[in-house]
């Protein structure tokens, strides 16, 4: 916990950053696309570097590293960026790497963010480049994210004479969450000033998505991904013999009622058109079959796509918990932890960028999708500056389905890698060429 002085100092620093950004003149909106010569240069460079980029992706897949432990991954990234002539900063937020590509022409700075960490999953794919690390796997596609960002850096560094501004490549650790007791991820990168020096005016990211076919991308304007909060509940009853339940207070029965009634928040307490998920994912209680349990512990997650709704959830949950426990004569302890806000793709920024995306990939390959209830800490960047995250299709064309994210069988089609690079290059160049970015708009301020 910060001291009062340290907290005040941090708040002043953030206020200065906010004022510095918002006092800059808003960049003019444009819906232009790149000229033919620049488009051809991107394609030539993509063809030239494609095999090396795929090689990097496979190396990363074979050598996954967990959150805040991405040591070798960071070394590889830093060495590649340095070889390209970028200004490289290592050890950001622990293992993070930041590469700054300065264009030859004056202009604003935009960023490309990629996450680096893997998951504690044993890979079950029979691939020549499957994970070599027992119990660790790139099952969420961060190996693709990293290789795509590196590929984008390769191409744009060769086109720096065309860059009307700068590109900051942010390679982030711990998107999946830092280990208990540690800081990490987007929050720590922002805290350490990754959006400063030079000030970043807009930021891009992508995430692989197995529901979409390789060669396509998916986008949503406005709220794109959900908030993510956790809750912890301990119900305290009174133990008794299983044959004499009237002498105890059954914590398991009470927990069952709580679990059931929490779902009435979604179905009865809130506007049914609002997307809300309340999931109890863990329950522990009891010691043997003939003893009334005196304690049950519950843990779960809450997801929303609306900031106002998110604010209401803890109170609605505790009202149900309190009422039921009192009616049983039990007690409880309830802890609600806010984790991530919803991820907001600013609509004006998205609309300004869509022509470039469609020009790069083709009109019918840029698909509007529904918001999803998964969460991403890229949302923290999107709270600060205009942001655009989109889905990159990785399902093999012709296949009706693919293994989902976080599956031991997750196997994205590598043909998506050049698609992601092409999309990122067009977005970044379009943002700098036509200065299609926005002054800072906080989604939170729009909700209040």
Where are the regions that the model predicts?
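Histidine/acidic-residue-rich, glycine-tolerant segments that coordinate divalent metal ions
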Residues: 127-137, 144, 161-282, 287-291, ...
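Bacterial N-terminal signal peptides
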Residues: 14-26
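Bacterial N-terminal signal peptides that target proteins for export
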Residues: 1-16
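Metal-dependent amide/peptide-bond hydrolase catalytic core
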Residues: 34, 83, 256-448
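Acidic/His- and Gly-rich active-site-bordering loop/insert found
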Residues: 34-137, 147-164
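Divalent metal-coordination and catalytic microenvironments
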Residues: 60, 99, 112, 142, ...
């Amino acid at each position: 916990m910060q001291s009062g002085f340290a907290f005040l100092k941090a708040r002043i620093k953030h206020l200065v950053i906010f004022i510095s950004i918002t006092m800059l003149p808003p960049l003019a909106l444009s819906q232009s696309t790149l000229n033919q010569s620049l488009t051809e240069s991107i394609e030539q460079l993509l063809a030239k570097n494609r095999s090396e980029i795929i090689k990097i992706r496979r190396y990363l897949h074979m050598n996954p590293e967990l959150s805040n432990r991405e040591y070798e991954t960071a070394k590889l990234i830093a060495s590649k960026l340095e070889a390209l002539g970028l200004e490289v900063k290592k050890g950001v937020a622990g293992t993070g790497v930041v590469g700054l590509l300065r264009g030859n022409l004056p202009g604003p700075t935009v960023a490309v963010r990629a996450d680096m960490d893997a998951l504690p999953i044993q890979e079950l794919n029979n691939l020549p480049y499957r994970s070599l690390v027992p119990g660790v796997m790139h099952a969420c596609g961060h190996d693709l994210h990293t290789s795509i960002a590196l590929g984008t850096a390769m191409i744009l560094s060769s086109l720096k004479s065309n860059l009307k501004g700068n590109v900051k490549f942010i390679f982030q650790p711990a998107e999946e969450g830092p280990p208990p007791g540690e800081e990490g991820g987007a929050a720590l990168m922002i805290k350490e000033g990754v959006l400063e020096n030079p000030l970043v005016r807009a930021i891009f990211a992508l995430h692989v998505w197995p529901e979409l076919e390789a060669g396509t991308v998916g986008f949503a304007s406005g709220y794109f991904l959900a908030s993510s909060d956790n809750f912890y509940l301990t119900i305290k009853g009174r133990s008794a013999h299983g044959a004499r339940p009237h002498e105890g207070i059954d914590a398991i029965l009470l927990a069952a009622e709580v679990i059931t009634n929490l779902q009435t928040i979604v179905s009865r307490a809130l506007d049914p058109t609002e997307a809300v998920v309340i999931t109890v994912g863990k329950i522990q209680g009891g010691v043997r079959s003939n003893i009334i349990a005196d304690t049950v512990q519950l843990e779960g997650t809450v997801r929303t796509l609306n900031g106002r709704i998110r604010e209401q959830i803890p109170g609605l949950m505790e009202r149900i918990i309190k009422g039921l426990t009192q009616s049983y004569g039990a007690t409880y302890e309830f802890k609600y932890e806010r984790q991530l806000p919803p991820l907001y793709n600013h609509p004006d920024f998205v609309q300004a960028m869509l022509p470039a995306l469609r020009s790069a990939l083709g009109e019918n390959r840029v698909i509007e999708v529904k918001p999803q209830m998964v969460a991403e800490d890229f949302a923290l960047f999107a709270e600060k500056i205009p942001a655009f995250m989109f889905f990159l299709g990785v399902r093999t064309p012709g296949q009706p389905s693919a293994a989902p994210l976080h599956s031991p069988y997750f196997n994205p089609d590598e043909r998506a890698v050049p698609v992601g690079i092409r999309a990122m290059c067009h977005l970044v160049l379009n943002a700098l060429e036509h200065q299609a970015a926005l002054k800072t708009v906080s989604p939170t301020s729009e909700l209040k």
